[in-house]
Amino acid sequence: MNVKEPAEEAAIQLRTERQRIEPEGEEQSEQPTDLRGLFPEEIAALLTPWGQPTFRGKQIFKWLQNRAVREVAEMTDLPQALRVRLGEAGWLKPLAPERHRVARDGTEKYLWRLADGELIESVLMPYRRAQTRDRVTVCLSTQAGCPLSCRFCATGRQGFRRNLTAAEIVGQVLDITHEKRKDDPDFKVTNLVFMGMGEPFLNYDNVRRAIGLFTHPEGQAIGQRRITVSTAGIVPGIDRFADEDWEVNLALSLHAADDKQRSEWMPVNDRFPLAQVLEACRRYWEKTRRRLSVEYALMAGVNDRLEDARRLASLFKGWPIHLNLIPVNAVAGIGVRRPEREPTERFLAELRRWGVDAVIREERGQDIEAACGQLRGAAKGEEEA
């Protein structure tokens, strides 16, 4: 038997995924019908052969996307015969809650089982505010696993399984909302970050559709400026994102300031070197005039020296960026250390000395492995809250 080495397997996965994000000839496999991945007019078209009026599409859409119901039987203003037929069609596929954990800081992690048995994770982060309304952020997964194999990331270590459908992406927010409204009828997610499991730009079409569903005025109606999509540097995806007619935010997972180090920790850099990624990000800024967010995971003795800070600052000289420093989180089997507070503060001060708008990002949910780089979509080894 010819067994491929892990690096070779990762390269094959990356080549396969590359083909999916090229603007020309992107192919989407036919997906099973799931009402939560459809817009009102699409639901209406689906029901036209049943002799249903057009307004049924908007009616059902609001039940699903605004009220976050999980059962057709809950759509009480639909005719009974239609509810029965919809139920028999099997077009509503809510995520199956596998495990729920709550951190000391109030962060919640949800483990979901998909219809085919795959596991994904989502994170709910409530931020309490005294003067303004509370901010409630959900960190979303876009793939089961991830093909990019970033060395410091738990998701990358488990390999790539498949892309999530738009319904599965949207379903993470809808099913969290459904659960939370049992105790708080006014619960609402206000912000979204596509920073969970997977690379969003390797599932571009489904991410794009999900954003459209999230922002639809008859659904969750989340403001575009309250949504951030993060990429490890998929250049065609960045260019496509820049051409979108929206105000969704872009974040770049950078984590190193030179090609040698970045390729060592992020193999995707071999396909899209740093210069290409930065050129694409500059094109994004020139087209949109929207400030780029940059994520930088600090690893003790790896990329946390003052010379690293100066090199990082030089990459973005004259750019209106916001840089988040993220002291790396513990992931079993990786062997990287989180830097102490003092060198982290020195790194931050050096960046600011060179004119970079930078902060040390507040980390949430570390005690339940819900922080950056810790999501892994696994049922074993976790304790139920």
From Swiss-Prot:
EC supergroup of this enzyme: transferase
Claim: Ion transport is one of the keywords in the record: no
Cofactor: how and how many bound: Binds 1 [4Fe-4S] cluster. The cluster is coordinated with 3 cysteines and an exchangeable S-adenosyl-L-methionine.
Family annotation (Pfam families): Radical_SAM, RlmN_N
Annotated Radical SAM core domain residues: 132-367
Domain of life: Bacteria
Residues that, per the record, bind [4Fe-4S] cluster: C146, C150, C153
Name recorded for this polypeptide: Probable dual-specificity RNA methyltransferase RlmN
Species per Swiss-Prot/TrEMBL record: Heliobacterium modesticaldum (strain ATCC 51547 / Ice1)
